A protein has these predicted regions:
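Cationic-aromatic interfacial patches
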Residues: 161-249, 254
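N-terminal Sec-pathway targeting helices
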Residues: 1-18
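Conserved, short, structured surface segments that act as functional micro-motifs
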Residues: 358-361, 382-426
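Surface-exposed, short loops/turns at beta-strand junctions within beta-sandwich domains
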Residues: 119-129, 140, 226-233
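Short, well-structured beta-strand-loop connectors
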Residues: 336-346, 378-393
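Surface-exposed, glycine-biased beta-strand/turn segments
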Residues: 249-354
Length: 426
């Protein structure tokens, strides 16, 4: 019995010595290379860590080895970056980040996570300093428990952080894209402006009409109308961004819209014209709102017959008259009058000149004007969805789609054709 006990004690001591040796060897041979790679980039350049603290688990987490490198005052110089929003690329292991960005005067312009940085806009070109810390912690762990083996992961993985400090000079220039360089009368051209700093609204000047910019995912968007009566040939488009003017040329191609026999119209009363100007004309120059449509538009009248189409020359008693900036339809009385696309009602009421009238703002300066309804079922300020009834049709419906004050061809909207549908989400 005594021998057996001595043997058991010997085995236990041997195992303990062996485990101790294994732990010693494991601890000794675990170096800084056991830490996760610090593969972090900013603006396409690799960042150099200037401080770190990592807890590397040994023997399945039964033992830890800590590698600590105190943060220094060293600041990495990245030089000149030519993009308005340098991309921050992080290693796959990153769980938590803290980023601060200062201007040359030391004012903190941004303090938040890498995810929040995606929505940050640099106010201007110039010099900046940034500090970034990237952590890896187990699920349910916190950044204050890095030196504790929490046993929250199986198998155990390294936990810790890298710190980066860097300077850079931002020197970004705006980039302008047009959806097309040539457009037929009645069409539209999309404009995308990106690559600029700050939140100043770009200004677009052209003789084709008033053009307003609205915020988009990576900059600004706008739409240029080429109305039925736009002069054919080249038109200068001047885009001014942060004091820099970029010029593009847009060529308008002539289109034959044909003629149509039309009945003579009685001159409207001065009071009717004045009421219309007071109620509707201010909408032409109203501030552009965010884009609301997505995809093609639907015709306001599901079943109809065209009486006068967009751009047609009206012929009365053999005499050619004016060209139509709108489309007049023969419709089924009482049938629903539909919103052509998502939008907000900006006018709903009766006018002496146009009868029951509904105007829907679809964003980016595009509005649909619906005249001659039998009934109105929406009110000003109401949000409507594509295809939603906004009232009941009468015998005739006049529809006019305008970018600002210039009418565009509604057929292209119903066909999902033209600049209004270019890079819709970008």
């Amino acid at each position: 019995m005594k021998r057996f006990l001595l043997w058991v004690v010997g085995v236990i001591l041997g195992v303990a010595v062996l485990l101790g040796a294994v732990m010693t060897v494991s601890y000794s041979f675990t170096g800084e290379g056991s830490r996760p790679a610090a593969d972090t980039q900013f603006g396409g350049q690799a960042l150099e860590a200037n401080g770190s603290c990592w807890q590397v688990p040994l023997l399945g987490g039964q033992l830890d080895k800590v590698f600590a490198s105190p943060a220094t005052l060293t600041v990495q110089k990245l030089g000149v970056l030519y993009t308005a929003h340098p991309e921050l690329s992080l290693p796959d292991w990153t769980c938590y980040t803290a980023l601060t960005i200062q201007n040359a005067a030391g004012d903190v312009l941004f303090a938040g996570s890498a995810g929040e940085y995606q929505n940050f806009l640099f106010p201007a070109n110039g010099e900046y300093k940034a500090e970034l810390t990237a952590w890896r912690v187990p699920k349910d762990g916190t950044i204050t428990q890095l030196r504790k083996n929490l046993g929250l992961e199986r198998p155990a993985k390294p936990t810790g952080w890298y710190r980066y400090s860097f300077r850079f000079t931002l020197q970004a220039s705006a980039e302008v894209e047009l959806s097309a360089e040539r457009v037929e009368q009645g069409g539209t051209v999309g404009v995308r402006i990106s690559g600029m700093t700050g939140d100043a609204v770009p200004a677009i000047e052209t003789d084709l009409g008033s053009v307003q910019c609205v915020r988009a995912a990576e900059g600004w968007r706008a739409y240029i109308p080429a109305a039925y009566n736009a002069s054919s040939g080249g038109h200068e488009i001047n885009i001014t961004v942060n004091g820099e003017t970029i010029t593009r040329t847009l060529t308008v191609l002539p289109k034959d819209f044909g003629t149509v026999e039309a009945e003579a119209e009685e001159p409207a009363a001065d009071s009717a014209n004045a009421q219309f100007r007071s109620a509707i004309w201010p909408l032409y120059e109203a501030a552009a709102t965010a884009k609301q449509w997505q995809g093609g538009f639907v015709p306001p009248a599901e079943d109809s017959m065209t009486l006068v189409d967009y751009g047609q020359i009206k012929v009365t008693n053999g005499q050619q008259g004016s060209r139509s900036n709108s489309t007049k339809l023969y419709t089924i009385p009482g049938a629903p009058c539909r919103a052509a696309a998502n939008g907000t009602v900006v006018f709903a009421g009766n006018l002496e000149l146009t009868g029951n009238t509904v105007v829907i703002d679809h964003g980016c300066g595009l509005r649909s004007y619906l005249y001659g309804l039998q009934e109105i079922s929406v009110s000003k300020g109401q949000t409507v969805e594509k295809g939603q009834a906004v009232g009941a049709l009468g015998e005739e419906l006049t529809m006019d789609f305008k970018l600002g004050s210039r009418s565009v061809n509604p057929r292209l909207l119903f066909q999902t054709s033209g600049g209004l549908f270019w890079k819709e989400n970008g």
